[in-house]
Amino acid sequence: MEEIKVNDNTERMPMIGDPAPEFRAITTMGKVDFPADYKGSWVVLFSHPADFTPVCTTEFIGFSKMAEEFEEINTKLIGLSIDSLHSHLAWSRSIEDIDLDGNGTVKVKFPIIADISMAVAKKYGMLQTVAKTQTVRAVFIIDPDGYIRTILYYPMSTGRNLPEIKRIILALQKHDEDNVSTPANWQPGDNVVVGAPLTLQGAEERMASQDEDMVVYDWYLTLNCPTC
């Protein structure tokens, strides 16, 4: 059997719940010390394959249009690819001339990391193509304490669902504020999931509950109506 050789220099891919790997980098808005510079804010750190490419351009226009929406929920955006700073700047300027949907043009007002050395991309497991010469469409949602709460990867051919990224952040914030979970397709104002009881007695009490704010489907599935 052929022996498998392990490269000890390979970065361990971060996982949900891990502290966000630290780095210092040059961006289109100056130097950044991450995550220290963003303590107290949620962060969407996302990578794209390359500047001046069509799918990435639509994503950056979309992120730019939603930038204020993210700010309203205490969330900062940071882009990244292994292109140069000059490439990022030129691409950002060209984006300003594109009216994609007839609703006007936008400016890219969030920083884009110029990760030419691939140091940040390696720390975050963003290099997954065979040649490893492009970053994949990765998304890391990082909380105000600097912990990774969500990791998303998209195929090279598929643009990201930006409203879904915002929805995830809102769901995480709801969880942190009220210690509840959110069901499939949850939107702010919808019913939330109440934790299941951990004992037989608790299960029996849940089934017998007369709480008008709760909808009990079974002992393990209870929804709470936040607007009741």
Question: Predicted segment positions?
Answer:
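Chalcogenol-based redox active-site neighborhoods
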Residues: 1-228
